């Protein structure tokens, strides 16, 4: 694990230096940019907000810090991707007659490319933020020979990732979509939490929203790799408050079918903190 972390830190540092040097070169095509330390501070500190937010106690402030850091990381990664793509295109163009034209190396061209890279990074990130708040519904029709489950409607949702960024507001939209399906049984297929249960800034409100799920046969869940261990007391208390039954290597039978919930293979015990 230490070797992996060191490798990730070095990779991130290299990416920051690469983007920073390209950004300085771009900014100097528009004005006399001398205070480069400001750019380096921004590039280093903004992504760290995501880590700092996770270290704070669950609150609206911690949520704002974490979301700001998360969005900053997203914008940075897309700018890194588009910058690398622009450099690759420029490298390939050097092999063509286009590279001999004065416009190829002009400040105007560099300025335009930098603006395009920045605009693409911001726009793609904005699309991701908007899309993340959208609940998509997909319908599958399944026929079972010799089964008495004709007309049975099952609603399955996964990856709620409750935590410092996602809480009751997102659960309200999800529950409204689930209830609109008028399902007979509801299944939550893992990753109910993003990490620790107590990271959720409005845990009680989120549980109250999930308790609104209306289904004839109940609401059932299994755990995913992001969830704490099944024996973690805060997790058990949350499921009880939300009216959700956890199936941890358990099965429940109904007329015509049996619902089986497998345990998460990478089980974590103890205090249940962190991911499994």
Q: Model regions: which residues?
A:
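A broad, low-specificity signal marking well-ordered, structured residues that form hydrophobic/aromatic
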Residues: 124, 140, 257
């Amino acid at each position: 694990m230490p070797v992996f972390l060191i490798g990730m830190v070095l990779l991130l540092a290299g990416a920051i230096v690469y983007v920073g040097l390209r950004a300085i070169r771009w900014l100097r095509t528009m004005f006399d940019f001398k205070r480069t330390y400001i750019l380096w501070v921004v590039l280093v500190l903004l992504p760290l907000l995501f880590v700092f937010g996770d270290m704070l106690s669950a609150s609206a402030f911690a949520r704002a810090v974490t979301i700001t850091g998360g969005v900053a990381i997203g914008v940075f990664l897309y700018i890194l991707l588009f910058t690398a793509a622009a450099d690759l295109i420029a490298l390939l163009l050097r092999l063509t007659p286009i590279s001999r034209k004065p416009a190829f190396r002009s400040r105007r061209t560099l300025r335009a490319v930098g603006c395009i890279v920045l605009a693409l990074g911001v726009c793609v990130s904005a699309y991701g933020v908007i899309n993340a708040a959208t609940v998509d519904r997909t319908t599958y029709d399944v026929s079972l020979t010799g089964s008495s489950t004709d007309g049975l409607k099952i609603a399955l949702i996964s990856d709620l990732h409750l935590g410092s960024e996602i809480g009751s507001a997102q659960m309200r939209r999800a529950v409204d979509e689930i209830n609109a399906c008028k399902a007979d049984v509801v299944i939550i297929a893992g990753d109910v939490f993003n990490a620790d249960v107590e990271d959720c800034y409005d845990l009680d409100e989120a549980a109250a929203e999930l308790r609104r799920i209306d289904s004839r046969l109940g609401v059932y869940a299994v755990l995913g790799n992001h969830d704490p261990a099944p024996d973690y007391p805060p997790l058990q208390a949350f499921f009880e408050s939300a009216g959700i039954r956890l199936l941890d290597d358990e099965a429940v039978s109904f007329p015509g079918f049996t619902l089986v919930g497998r345990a998460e293979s990478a089980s974590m015990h103890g205090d249940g903190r962190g991911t499994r």
